[in-house]
Amino acid sequence: DRQWSRGLGDVYKRQVLTTASRETLRKQASWLRKNSKITVVLEGHADERGTREYNLALGERRANAAKDYLMTYGISSDRISVLSYGKERPVDSGSNPLAWSKNRRSVTVKAN
């Protein structure tokens, strides 16, 4: 399973890392420091509201916020790629606040 974490929650229309997200990223940074050959892809996702273009840009900002946070813990930027799916890959297909909350996320995936 290449997927490492999901659900790094974000606030609507923002790329804010929650307290729980920061803790998850700290643990990932610690693991990555011990496994220096591993690279990761940070995927940014958005809910269904907004245009495709807007949500792709928002997903990229979310993934970059996670990347910046990992870098503050000493993980080199050349080990981290960023990819935005915008609203194209929801984890919940519902059209309600709970589904939207689940779909606003960053996901860390092991690249190798």
PLM region spans:
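Periplasmic OmpA-like peptidoglycan-binding domain that tethers envelope proteins to the cell wall
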Residues: 45-112
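Periplasmic peptidoglycan-binding/anchoring modules of Gram-negative envelope and division proteins
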Residues: 13-43, 67-72, 77, 108-112
